[in-house]
């Protein structure tokens, strides 16, 4: 039996765990200091009543013979939920076919599981700084990783370089951790680059609900959807 040698290339601990340990040590040494936390985020408000009511109703249905149900009829998720997602996107000018919508257990899992579709010889392009999951998933698979600087010089929004080739590129907008957000025109440039390089864009839109300024993109699909080379994880 052989272990996956690439696991030894991972950092010793998850970034946010390291930050938590450093914060705890600093607090112990400086109990009178207030700390502004810029590490991993967490919820700060209770769930809306409409959400908790729906959860209670779903649990009650599972306790009655008439409404009990087991596995979801479709591997793509409940149709009523996929339909709601379709309507949500349509409200922002993006038309999606129901067959294109897949409900999973979350974007974090998708970002790793999607990689099973691609050979380990593919080169991956990620922004720097970066959400650690993008890097760790590919390190464990043994893929080559290229970094593109996201700094004040480019407003923390790296743009494609025609001299750089990659097979998979990760874009997060609004970005984690910088908060920078691509415009529709900037994403058009990324789509053009992806087509020219026969590459796939993995677009992490986990924070799109914070976009309110006109001209900023809420979805990669806002860019000429036909023949688009991208997958989005909201």
PLM feature segments, named:
Residues 2-105, 113:
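N-terminal small-domain helix-loop-helix segment of the aminotransferase-like
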Residues 35-37, 145-147, 229:
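Conserved beta-strand scaffold positions in the cores of enzyme catalytic domains, especially
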Residues 42, 208, 232:
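Acidic-residue sensor for enzyme active/binding pockets
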Residues 65-194, 208-222:
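Conserved core of the PLP fold type I
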Residues 196-199:
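A short helix->loop->beta-strand "cap" motif at the edges of active sites that frequently abuts
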Residues 202:
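Generic enzyme active-site microenvironment
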Residues 205:
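Walker B catalytic acidic pair
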Residues 227-234:
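Single conserved hydrophobic/aromatic residue that forms the stacking wall/gate
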């Amino acid at each position: 039996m052989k272990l996956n040698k690439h696991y030894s290339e991972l950092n010793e601990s998850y970034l946010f765990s390291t930050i938590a340990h450093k914060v705890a040590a600093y607090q112990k040494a400086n109990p009178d200091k207030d700390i502004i936390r810029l590490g991993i985020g967490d919820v700060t408000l209770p769930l809306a009543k409409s959400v908790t009511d729906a959860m209670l109703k779903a649990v009650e249905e599972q306790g009655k013979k008439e409404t009990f149900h087991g596995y979801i009829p479709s591997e793509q998720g409940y149709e009523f939920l996929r339909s709601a997602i379709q309507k949500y996107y349509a409200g922002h000018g993006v038309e999606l076919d129901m067959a294109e919508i897949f409900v999973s257990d979350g974007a974090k899992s998708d970002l790793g599981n999607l990689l099973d579709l691609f050979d380990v010889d593919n080169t991956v392009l990620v922004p720097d700084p970066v959400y650690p999951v993008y890097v760790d998933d590919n390190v464990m698979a043994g893929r080559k990783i290229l970094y593109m600087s996201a700094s004040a010089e480019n407003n923390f929004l790296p743009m494609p370089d025609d001299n750089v080739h990659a097979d998979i590129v990760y874009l997060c907008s609004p970005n984690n951790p910088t908060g920078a957000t691509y415009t529709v025109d900037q994403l058009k440039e990324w789509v053009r680059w992806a087509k020219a390089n026969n590459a796939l864009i993995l677009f992490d839109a986990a924070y799109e609900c914070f976009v309110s300024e006109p001209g900023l993109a809420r979805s990669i699909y806002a860019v000429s959807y036909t023949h688009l080379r991208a997958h989005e994880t909201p």
